[in-house]
Amino acid sequence: MSITFGELVGNFILVTGSVIVLLLLIKKFAWGAIESILQTRSQQISRDIDQAEQSRLSAQQLEAKSQANLDASRSQASKIISDAKEIGQLQGDKLVAEATDEAKRLKEKALTDIEQSKSDAISAVKTEMSDLTVLLAKKIMGANLDKTAQSQLIDSYLDDLGEA
């Protein structure tokens, strides 16, 4: 089966005419609806893009605000920690100073007590010595002793001093 040139041209004209008629019918009856659908879809896509952009900007602002809050929180935490360290150091220094002052006070009191005890002991020894001296003088005055008796009395006195 072979197709002639005339048949080929006839088919071409028929198909071309059919396509043109079809396009005219589509333009008259369906093109408005198709164009409306395409316009609506285009507007929807445009709104979606705008909303996505707004969401992105909002997310960026929220991220920036969150980062600022996080930085502020970190700064506050660092300040709280440094303040706590400083307060701890000050309290430690205060306790050390108080302990040092207390130790000095106790040392001074102990030295004062030692001096008082020493003074009391010296006073007691002096009183004892004076009492013994008076006693010895009474014994010497009460008896006219010769040199050996005096020597024995002095030795006895010295022995009494050694025991006291």
Swiss-Prot record:
It is found in: Cell membrane. Keywords: ATP synthesis, Cell membrane, CF(0), Hydrogen ion transport, Ion transport, Membrane, Transmembrane, Transmembrane helix, Transport. The keyword Lyase does not apply. InterPro entries: ATP_synth_B-like_membr_sf, ATP_synth_b/b'su_bac/chlpt, ATP_synth_F0_bsu_bac, ATP_synthase_B_chain. It comes from the Bacteria. GO terms for molecular function: proton-transporting ATP synthase activity, rotational mechanism; proton-transporting ATPase activity, rotational mechanism. It holds the Pfam family ATP-synt_B. Belongs to the ATPase B chain family. F-type ATPases have 2 components, F(1) - the catalytic core - and F(0) - the membrane proton channel. F(1) has five subunits: alpha(3), beta(3), gamma(1), delta(1), epsilon(1). F(0) has three main subunits: a(1), b(2) and c(10-14). The alpha and beta chains form an alternating ring which encloses part of the gamma chain. F(1) is attached to F(0) by a central stalk formed by the gamma and epsilon chains, while a peripheral stalk is formed by the delta and b chains. F(1)F(0) ATP synthase produces ATP from ADP in the presence of a proton or sodium gradient. F-type ATPases consist of two structural domains, F(1) containing the extramembraneous catalytic core and F(0) containing the membrane proton channel, linked together by a central stalk and a peripheral stalk. During catalysis, ATP synthesis in the catalytic domain of F(1) is coupled via a rotary mechanism of the central stalk subunits to proton translocation. This is ATP synthase subunit b. It comes from Streptococcus pyogenes serotype M3 (strain ATCC BAA-595 / MGAS315).
